[in-house]
Structure formats: C-alpha cells, structure tokens
UniProtKB/Swiss-Prot annotation:
Name this polypeptide is given: R3H domain-containing protein 1
Gene3D superfamilies recorded: R3H-like domain (3.30.1370.50)
SUPFAM superfamilies: R3H domain
Amino acid composition bias (Polar residues), ranges on this chain: 338-349, 360-370, 797-817
Gene: R3HDM1
Biased composition (Basic residues): 960-969
Length: 1099
C-alpha cells in the first residue's frame, strides 16, 4: 500500500465538514436515545442544548486519535438516525458546536506553532500559516518539511533497506523505536539521542513516513518527534521489503547458475569422478608415480652403464619391505639434500649402494662419479647409524664419491643423507698418512654396515690390515651384551667385517676376540702427495653429527699381541657438540689369538714421484720394536681444515646405558681448496708410558660458535681446550703459545705441542708428574694463551721441546726452549714457564701430540671451568672394577645429555668431564654449517653432575704428595645448562659492597656461619695478574701468602656458601628476603664438586 504524496487542503476541508455533519447526526441520535430512556429530559429543551454542547466537545477531543473509528461508527449510526431525524428535527445546537469547534482548532494551531521550529524556507512557512484555518496543521508541517526536497519517502526507504546493509540496521532500529513510541500513549513526544547528520536525516524521513512531527532541539544534534493526528503505522514493515528483495535476488541467481552450469555440466561431473577415483587409489597411484619417477631419474644418468643394474635391482626389490625401504631412503634423501636437483644424483647413488664395488683406482676423481661409494645416512633416530667410509687415501680430494651435488665440491659438503643403508658392502682398501715413526696409520675401509662404523688402523708402514678395527655403535649399543652379533635392523642380516666374518660386539673390558685377525705384513708407507692434503678426509656430510650422538670408536688390537701397548692401552674419545649428537669412541681390548683369516688386499701404491711422508714424531727413546701407541684412537685428518678426532688411550665400559643424545658433530673438509697458508691444528695426544696402563680421555668440545681452534689472532685463546695431565708434585709452569701477526690467514693448528717421554728428555716431567694444561682467556693475553702447567721437580727448570717432523711435510716444528722462571719456593710457589710456538705452515694432516700416561683436563676458558680428571694408573695390574658412574655437567649454552663415564676401579678417582663455554665462530674456519671444520672434534659433557662422586675424587696433587698446594680448587665448577634445576647445598653470594676486601666480607657472613655454612673463595681468573696465571688455583688463605693480603678485594672472588643440607640452603634463601643484608644469596649457575670445594674453605 502506497501512501499518496500530498493531500490537498481542499479535500481535507471537505472531510472535516462531513465529519462535523456526522457529529451533528450523532448528537441527534443520542438525544433520541436519552429521550427514550429519560422522558423528562425530552420536555426540557434547554437541558438538551447543554447536553448537545457537551456531547459535541467530547468527540472533538478524541477526534485526533479515533478519526477512522468515529467515521465508521458514525456511518452506522447515521443509517439509524435518518428516520428519527424526520420526526424530531434537531435543535439549534450545531451552531454552538461550530463555534466551539473553531475555538478548539485555533487553540491547537497556536500550540503547534509554538512547538514547531521555523523552517529554512520562510515562504513555505507563510504558505502553511495561510492554510491554518483549513483545520490540518501537523500533517502539513511534516509533509512540507520532507516534500520540499522532492524525496519520495517510500522509495527512498525501500532502496536504502535493500542496498545499504549499514543503513538497513539503522532504519530497522529507528522503526522499532518509533513503533514503541507510537504504542506508548503516555508520552506525546520523544527525544532521540544525539547522532550524526546522516542519521538525523534518516530519522527525519522515517518520522515523516510514520506521520510524526519531527524537529531538532536547540543544540541541533538531537531529533524530537511528536505525535500528530496523522500518525500512522505503515502496513508493511521494513523487514518485509528486505525479504522480498532477497527472494528476488535468490531467484535470479538460481536462474543464472542453472544456465551457466549447463555448458560445463559434463566436465564438472568428470572432474568429480576423477577426484573420487584418486581418493580411492591414492596409495597405488603414489607407488606407480614413485616408480615412474625413479625410472625417469635413473634413465637420465647413463654414466657407468647403470641402467641394466637398476632394472635388475628393481625387479629384485618388488616385495613390500624393499619398496618401503627405498621409499624411506628417497624421502630422507630428498629432505637432506634440500634441492630437487640433488635428489636425482643422490637417489641414483643410493641405489648403487647395493652394487658390488669395482676395483679401486688411484685415477678416480670427481668427474668419474664413483657412485659405488657408500653413502652416509642421515638417521633421524638413533636406531640406525650407517657407515662412514673412505674410498681411498690417494690424497685426491675428489676421491670421495658424491652423494649429492651440493653446488661446491670445495666446500666439502659431500653427501646428502640418504636414509638407512642395509647393504653389506665389501671394503675398499685405502691407506692413511703416516702418523708418526712408530704410530699406526688409520685405515678407513668402506664397510657399509648400518649400525656400525668400521675403521681399520694398522702399524705405520702397513697397508689396510684387519689387525685393528673400529665400529661405530649407536646409543643402544651400551646395553648390548658382550659376544652379541650385530644385526642390521633394516635388513635383519648380521654386519659383516671386511674379512667376511660377522661382527661380534665385545665391550672394551672383555678379553674376547672381536674377530679373527692377523696383522698385515709390514710394508713401507705409501707416499702421499703434500699438494693434496684433503686426501684422507673422513667424514664429508652436511649434517653428519645429527646421526652420531655418541660415536663409539672401538679399537681392536692385533691378535698376536705384537703391539706391546695394545694389551695395556685403550682409547677413549668423546665427540660431542653442544646441540648435536655425540658418540663415545672406545677401544677394544686385545683378543685372544684366533685362527687368522687372510687379511684384505693391500691398497695399490700411489703414482710415483710423490714424496714419502716422514715420521711425525720420534720414538722418544722407545725402540722401534716397541712402537709408541700414538695411533690408538687417533683419527687422522689430512684435510687442512678437517678436525682431528683425538683418541687418547683409556678404558670405557660399554655396558653403561646412561648415554643421551646430544647435538651432532659436523664434519666437513674443503676439497681441492688451496689455502693461502697451510692450516695447522693443535693436537693433543699422550704417548703412553711403557710400563703403566692408564685411562685417558681427550675432552674436545665444540661450542655453539661452531669453532674450537682458530687461526685468527686474539681468538685462539677462546678456542683451544685445556688438558690436565697428572705428574708428581712440582711447581706449575705457564706455557704461552703466541699466535703471530694479525695478517696471518685463519688457520687451524695441525702441528701439535709434543710432550716427549721422560726417557728421551731428562728435563721433562718424570712419570707420575701432574701437568696442567689450560687456556687463558683472550682478555689476559693478546696471543694464543695455552697455559701448560708442569708440576715438575724443583731441580728441572727447562723443558726442551724437541724437533718434530710433520708427517706430510718437510717442514719441522722448531725446537722450543721453555725457559722456566726462578726455582720454586720451598712453600710451594708457582714458577711460570713461557713457551712460544710459531705458526709453522703445515699442509698435511696434523700428527697426534704426545702426552704422558695420566691425563687431566682443565678448561680455564672462563675462570672456573677447570675440570680435573683423576688418573687411573696400573689398570692391568689391578683388577678392573666399575665404580659409581659420574655424569659431568652440561655445557651452559646447550645442555647435552651424556652417559656416565665409569672409572676402572673404585679406589681410583672417577673420571669427570667438564664443559667449556661457547666461543664465537671465527671467519675462515669454513662453512658455519660444518662446525668442526678446521678444528678438533668436540666433546660436550652431560647435563647434571649427580653428586654420587666417590670420595676419591680429589685434586691430582693429593695423589702425588702435593697436598701443600691447592691448584685445582676451581676445577669443580662448571656451568649449568639452561633450565636445569640446581640440586645441591652451594649458594653463591653476590652483590657484596663495592671495594670491600675479603677479610671485611667474611665479617658480614655471621648469619651464615651460625647455620653451619662454610664460605668458599674461588678466585676469578680475570682478576688474576697476567704474570701469575694460575691453572687451577684456589682461594685458600694458606695456599698463597698473596691471597691473605688485606687489600685483597672480595670482588675478585666468586664467593660460595656451602650449607650442611639442602633444606638449610633453601631456608637461607627464604630468610634473605625478609632480612636486610649487604649481600644476596642465589642458586649458583655452576655445579661445584663438594670434595674439591672443601679445599677452598675459608674456615
């Protein structure tokens, strides 16, 4: 229903006249009814006139609200009153009613004029005022206000409701409020809250549409509406317009959609059908696509005529297990290579793992694509560790078969991890560069076993001999019973040694033969070209360390016992980086002589014209028949920037199951990359004593900075690890290794610092003398600060470092005179010794340095990082027994879990390994992805030192009569890893007053003394004078008279409070919150050995 735009005033006036006539008739009818009911009233006409006036005013008052109802009812009454009017004419009351009606209308007009605000158009206002006598005022005002703009209200509202969702909500809200206002008879006017001009315009139009009078208040922000006689409720609500619009649009869309879909209806059905088929056959189709992709990839590679082999191999591997395995290899290889281009080559070479090896050729190079080199798996779990093999030792950096095209052969990132290797491949014999004149070279045959890594090392000058072999076992090997045959978990077949016999697992402590072996016949050492230093790189892989959390390298000595040291020494090397996986390398004991199988064929000699490497180190007085066991556990790193795996002799019981995976050790070698200056690596290895068995371990740790040894000046002090070697009670010496000029390229030291045997150097420390080797931070020394403390007899004041010959170079390490200071005082003073070692360029693999029997490792990189490793001597003489295991603390940047290292006998002190802090990565060390490039393999200690350390744990000086000195007090501290809970009784005292001395500070600790706490003073290494560097110095008052000076500042010490119990330490922490002290207690960020802290007590 649409309302007309305008209603003329003429029509309105005629309507009013009709209404007035109807009111008159109604009055007559009412008079007749009253006359019938009340006969007395009919006689008295005057009373009739009064009643007529009253009745006339009553309908006029209610006219504005009940116009239609009065009209309809008057019509009904009009029909009844016609006949009655004929008989009794009406009295002259209409005249009076007209006068009263005009008076009432005049009053209403005046009231409307007062409430209505003057319009903007004055002409329209005057026009409206002229029409006032025509009896319709409020209707005119609303229509004139809205119609002046020429807006069709109905059309405007309908379009707004359909097209503008935001205005639609506003209109619906206004509609509801106006409906509520109209339905409420109590309030004639309503004032809306202030709103914007656009919303006020909407409100004006909605009010006009409802027949309301609408104006704004004095502020001009709010709209006021008033009820009028024309107020109405439209027949259609706003919602109905919206519904109609949606219905029409929906119908239109439906029609368009049906028309458009008629063209591609068949295509859509086909697509849906294809999707359904694909959904039901996804597995089968993937298998087919996978096979087709492999066929296509392999068909592209026509080198070495591999097509026929691939076809035959695919036919053999049709079974489900082979398919699953190859899918896994392909998937892992794709993830490891990281490039789609790499997956082609690496997948091809993975398939070649199953082929039989072709004869080795010294002419093999990268261009020949020796794909039958076994790949190095990237084991996502520790269930399978595949082989790491070396194909040849010719010195050619390209001799290693490419596992994936990494884009740069010089980067040495050879090999993308290719999943699990299950094929047992026969070894490719190879030679290693000579380690020393009497050391056995390390030979790495390509024994492609899944969970074991086999390294063969023979005597110097021998070819690949099965006399010694190393097997890399995963963490699960710790729980394997002795004598078990190692079985490949992927194929279910036992691992095969190079000689064809199954691999039998025997822990180092057992005396059972691992496999029947005979030493190979001695042969002259094969020449190795110095110009190809990267020939013998061992591991070349992007992320090798993630597979080897703990690499166990077990050495099996020769069966006939020709090696005098094989029966006494075992090698232990812990390889571990902060956030990667590590393994323990252990050496197997000499087996009983079994029936000797034929040894593998020796490798062919290298091309002539290449120099033969000379002996790396002299025998130090040992006869040639008794070669010094330098080769034990030593992995040769011929690459200039390859790390050295230092394996010092020692015992390790492989049945301990406490190993935990730690961040991986990355290996990398720069292949065919000429260096501006040949790199050197400082190696540390001990020459075993002829008469004693010992336990040794090299703690080579890789920090988060991915760098250990750096050739950059002012940074090597942060790079080199410390080594502590126990000897007899003698003063400590300071050895400084200067770095050289600033312009030297980044190098790694391959020329080791050699400590010859006592038989050759009378001035060297005698047997049993503790030698402390540590590193002073770069802040104290500008050059390489490698402090070696020799506890030597007072009479010996010089240590002659003999000339040593690099294995692969004619250059020799010049003999260095280590001149000691004045003789040690009788009270046990420190005598400093300076050792200057220049940077001799070495282009070959570094030779292992030589040490004495008992070894301690002290890391003074940041002061309190000294760790002592208790010596275990005479292992063969004493019955080996396992004592309580020790878990050394984790490295602070990244705590890593390491298994416990058990000592050989309970009476001997346990072996504890402490970490070193992270160091920044030095440019020039190689790619940052390969953290061990150009540096020794790292050792990362375990997370928590569990406190069940035997009482024998003490400083080495106490074992050798050096009880007067307390050099190793700070050896018991090490950083705790992030997130570790401190379990102990030691709290650190911090926030002491500035400038306070040590004696004054002790007076402040009265409250702590009352509860039984003991104060330990550990000197800060940064605060020590450079001319008095202490390897493992303590802060005891009795250790050094200098310590007790009144001017000794407390800020130069790390103050620790040891409480009698953990609860007492916790109570002290709680009490300090409420008490006002001049110091603060906090849980120490380091772990401290209580037995060694006892010597640092100030009480």
């Amino acid at each position: 229903m649409r309302m007309s735009d305008t209603v003329t005033v003429k029509d309105e006036t005629a309507t009013m006249k009709d209404l007035e006539a109807e009111v008159k008739d109604t009055t007559r009818v009412e008079n007749l009814i009253k006359s019938e009911n009340y006969g007395k009233i009919l006689v008295e006409k005057n009373e009739h006139c009064i009643e007529n006036n009253i009745d006339l005013q009553r309908p006029l008052q209610s006219f504005g609200q009940t116009g239609k109802r009065s009209k309809s009812s008057s019509k009904l009454k009009l029909v009844r009153s016609l006949a009655v009017c004929e008989e009794s004419p009406p009295p002259p009351a209409p005249e009076i009613s007209q006068e009263n009606q005009e008076k009432i209308q005049i009053q209403l007009t005046q009231s409307f004029e007062k409430e209505e605000k003057p319009s903007k158009d004055e002409a329209e206002k005057e026009k409206a005022s002229d029409k006032l006598p025509r009896k319709m005022l409020s209707r005119d005002s609303s229509q004139e206000y809205t119609d002046s703009t020429g807006i069709d209200l109905h059309e405007f509202l309908v379009n707004t409701l359909k097209n503008n969702p935001r205005d639609r909500m506003m209109l619906l809200k206004l509609e509801q409020e106006i409906l509520d206002f109209i339905g409420n008879n109590e309030s004639p006017r309503k004032k809306f809250p202030p709103m914007t001009s656009y919303h006020r315009m909407l409100l004006h139009r909605v009010a006009a549409y409802f027949g309301l009078d609408h104006n704004v208040d004095q502020s001009g922000k709010s709209v006021i509406v008033n009820k009028t006689s024309n107020t109405r409720i439209p027949d259609q609500k706003f919602n109905e317009h919206i519904k109609d619009d949606k219905g029409e649009d929906f119908q239109k869309r439906y029609i368009l959609k049906r028309d458009n879909s008629s063209f591609d209806k068949d295509d859509n059905q086909m697509r849906i059908r294809l999707k359904d088929d694909r959904r039901s056959k996804s597995i089968e189709e993937r298998e087919e696509e996978y096979q087709r992709a492999r066929d296509r990839i392999f068909s592209q590679d026509s080198l070495c005529s591999q097509e026929n082999y691939i076809i035959d191999k695919r036919l053999q591997d049709e079974d489900a297990s082979s398919t699953q395995q190859r899918r896994q290899i392909f998937r892992v290889n794709k993830d490891a290579s990281g490039r789609s281009t790499n997956s082609h080559q690496s997948s091809t070479e993975n398939e070649l793992k199953y082929s039989e090896p072709r004869p080795w050729s010294s002419t093999d190079s990268d261009s020949s694509l020796r794909n039958l080199k076994p790949a190095v798996t990237k084991a996502s779990s520790f269930s399978g560790i595949s082989v790491l093999t070396r194909g040849d030792s010719s010195g050619s950096s390209k001799s290693i078969g490419r596992l994936s095209k990494t884009g740069s052969e010089s980067s040495g990132s050879v090999g993308s991890s290719t999943g699990s290797l299950s094929h047992i491949q026969q070894p490719l014999p190879g030679t290693a560069l000579s380690q020393s004149s009497h050391g056995a070279p390390v030979v790495y045959p390509t024994v492609s076993t899944h969970s074991s890594l086999s390294f063969d090392g023979g005597l110097n000058g021998q070819v690949a001999s099965p006399s010694t072999s190393f097997f890399l076992l995963p963490l699960e090997a710790a729980g394997i019973p002795p004598g078990s045959i190692l079985i490949n978990p992927q194929t279910g077949q036992p691992f095969i040694n190079p000689d064809g016999s199954p691999v039998v697992y025997n822990p180092p402590m057992t005396q059972q033969p691992v496999r029947s072996q005979v030493p190979g016949p001695p042969q002259p050492p094969l020449p190795a070209p110095p110009q190809q230093p990267a020939a013998n790189h061992i591991f070349s892989q992007d992320n090798l360390g993630s597979q080897f959390s703990h690499m166990s390298l077990a050495r099996q000595p020769s069966a006939d016992g020709s090696d005098p040291h094989a029966a006494m020494f075992q090698s232990t090397v812990v390889l571990q980086s902060p956030q990667q996986s590590g393994y323990i390398m252990t050496a197997a004991p000499p087996p009983h002589p079994p029936p000797p199988p034929p040894p593998p064929p020796p490798p062919p000699p290298l091309p002539p014209g290449q120099p033969v490497p000379t002996a790396g180190y002299p025998a130090s007085g040992h006869p040639v028949s008794q070669p010094v066991l330098q080769q034990q556990g030593y992995i040769q790193q011929p690459s200039p920037q390859m790390p050295a795996c230092y394996c010092a002799p020692g015992h390790y019981h492989s049945s301990q199951p406490q190993y935990r995976p730690v961040p991986s050790v990355h290996y990398n070698s720069h292949l065919n990359q000429p260096l501006p200056q040949p790199a050197q690596q400082t190696g540390y290895q001990v020459i075993p004593n002829q008469q004693q068995n010992y336990q040794g371990i090299v703690g080579v740790q890789q920090p988060q900075s991915q760098s250990l040894v750096s050739g950059q000046p002012n940074s090597i002090g942060n790079q080199i690890q410390g080594v502590v070697i126990p000897y007899t009670s003698v003063p400590t010496y300071q050895v400084s290794l200067p770095q050289g000029s600033q312009g030297i390229p980044h190098q790694t030291y391959q020329q080791p610092v050699m400590f010859p045997n006592q038989s050759n150097q009378g001035s060297m420390p005698t047997t049993g003398m503790p030698v402390y080797y540590s590193v002073i931070p770069p802040g104290q020394q500008n050059n390489l600060s490698s402090s070696v403390g020799y506890l030597q007899h007072p009479g010996s004041e010089q240590v002659q470092f003999p000339r040593t010959t690099s294995p692969c170079s004619s250059q020799q390490l010049q003999g260095h005179q280590c001149t000691a200071g004045p003789p040690p005082p009788p009270g046990g003073g420190m005598v400093m010794m300076q050792l200057s070692v220049p940077n001799n360029p070495q282009s070959c693999a570094h030779s292992p340095p030589q040490w004495k029997q008992n070894k301690y490792y002290c890391d003074h990189q940041r002061g309190q990082k000294c760790v002592e490793f208790s010596s275990v001597d005479n292992i063969v003489q004493h019955s080996p027994q396992l004592s309580s295991p020790i878990i050394s603390p984790a490295q602070s940047p990244a705590p890593a879990q390491l298994s416990t290292l058990k000592t050989v006998r309970p009476s001997g002190p346990p072996l504890s390994i402490m970490p070193q802090f992270s160091r920044p990565f030095v440019p020039g060390q190689g790619d940052s992805r390969y953290p061990l490039l150009g540096q020794p393999l790292q050792y990362n200690p375990p997370a928590v030192l569990h406190g069940h350390i035997p009482n024998q744990q003490g400083q080495p000086g106490s074992r050798h009569g050096n009880r007067g000195r307390r050099q190793a007090k700070k050896a018991a501290s090490t950083d705790l890893g992030a997130g570790e809970t401190v379990v102990g009784k030691v709290l650190e005292i911090t926030e002491l007053p500035d400038g306070i001395t040590r004696m004054e500070a002790e007076k402040l600790f009265g409250e702590l003394f009352k509860i039984g706490a003991k104060i330990r003073w550990l000197r800060d290494p940064q605060s020590q004078p450079r001319r008095h560097p202490l390897c493992c110095g303590s802060g005891d008052n009795t250790a050094n008279p200098e310590r007790s000076k009144p001017s000794d500042l407390a800020s130069t010490y790390t103050v620790l409070a040891t409480f009698p119990s953990i609860s007492a330490a916790q109570n002290a922490l709680k009490k300090q919150i409420n008490s006002v002290n001049k110091f603060k207690l906090r849980t120490s960020k380091k772990h401290y050995d209580f037995h060694i802290l006892e010597r640092a007590s100030s009480q």
